[in-house]
Amino acid sequence: MLLRAALLDLYNGESNRGIPMLKNILDRYSDTLEFDHFDVRAGCEIPDLSYDIFVFSGGPGDPLESGGKWQEPFFDLIGKLWQWNLRHENKKHVFFICHSFQMACHHFGVGEVSHRYKMSFGTYPVHKTHQGKEEPLFNQLPDPFYIADFRRYQVTKPNHDRLQAMGAHILCLEKLRPHMHYERAVMAIRFSPEMIGTQFHPEADPEGLLTYFMEEERRNAIVEEHGESRYDRMIRDLANPMKIRRTFDSVIPGFLENAIEQLSMEMV
């Protein structure tokens, strides 16, 4: 009997690379795992609790924007997943990415979600916290390790009392900027043994993104908005097997393999 995963698409119908890359990763586990795709924002599609694994994607726009019909059932699902894991032996395994990570942080009250002073676009180092150095999904990664980051919003001002009450831990922080006075954003949180989220995009496939970003029209648009030096650095980092490739190979595959192992043990 195959395990079941729900892929929650928060891209609101916009063209993106995140969902195809997540589907490609999930397809690798087709011998033990089947998955369904849910168009959360554009289609108001929300999975029920019959799934074993829930992968929440990134997406565009303001994570604090209200009024969408999908939002109440979306936050209701997060609450139900948390309560399920408190009450049941057979756990639900959850991964939040970027936009959904920001929404989860807002839902749990673990930090302040705000507009970033400047859009983050490209590849950057992030630094592990003490707990991040103990995080199994980051075991194969150096400190700092490199991530793909594309966002206009951030999570800062962590609520340490709330984190402690939940048993949650901040795993890594934005790169150090000694010449700037901005607070470093939270880049990953382990909410519980079964629930984790990252501000960055661990699904970023470096080979696929290289092809995508090197198309002339796209290259010209990026250089115009973000500058040639940032574009060149991103291309170098995507091509370097010790940078984005290591994160891509480690984080989501590690999450899925751990979830499959734990769920398979529960089924015995």
Where are these regions (language model features)?
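Short loop/helix-cap segments at secondary-structure boundaries that form the rim of catalytic
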Residues: 45-50, 105, 160-164
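N-terminal beta1-alpha1 cap of cysteine-dependent amidohydrolase-like domains
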Residues: 1-85, 206-210, 216, 221-268
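Cysteine-nucleophile active-site neighborhood
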Residues: 61-132
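Active-site metal-binding loops of divalent metal-dependent hydrolases
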Residues: 59-60, 101, 152, 202
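Short, solvent-exposed loop/turn segments that connect beta-strands within catalytic domains
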Residues: 1, 87-91, 179-182
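Short hydrophobic segments within beta-strands
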Residues: 6-10, 97, 150
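Pocket-forming structural segment of enzyme catalytic cores
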Residues: 108-207
